[in-house]
């Protein structure tokens, strides 16, 4: 059976944390900031953790990632 490969697109978007979680960055941050408040733009800059519902699926895609 061949070795499982890391899903490269996912590997670029997620980083593994020290406790084994997955860190992600937020969507809606590339353009059209005039419709967003300063508070919303500031909060979008922060990283976030992958939700519990998505974690299992994403973990399989980046299983071999360090």
Swiss-Prot record:
InterPro entries: Ribosomal_bL35, Ribosomal_bL35-like, Ribosomal_bL35_CS, Ribosomal_bL35_sf. Residues 1-16 have a biased composition (Basic residues). Keywords: Ribonucleoprotein, Ribosomal protein. One of its GO terms (molecular function) is structural constituent of ribosome. Coiled coil: none annotated. One of its GO terms (cellular component) is cytosolic large ribosomal subunit. GO terms for biological process: translation. PROSITE patterns: RIBOSOMAL_L35. Residues 1-21 are annotated as: Disordered. Belongs to the bacterial ribosomal protein bL35 family. This is Large ribosomal subunit protein bL35. The gene is rpmI.
């Amino acid at each position: 059976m061949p070795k499982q490969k890391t899903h490269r697109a996912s590997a670029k978007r997620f980083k593994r944390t020290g406790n084994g979680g997955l860190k992600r960055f937020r969507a809606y941050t590339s353009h059209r900031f005039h419709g967003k408040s300063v508070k919303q733009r500031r909060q979008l800059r922060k990283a976030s953790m992958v939700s519990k519902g998505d974690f299992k699926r994403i973990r399989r895609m980046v299983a071999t990632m360090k």
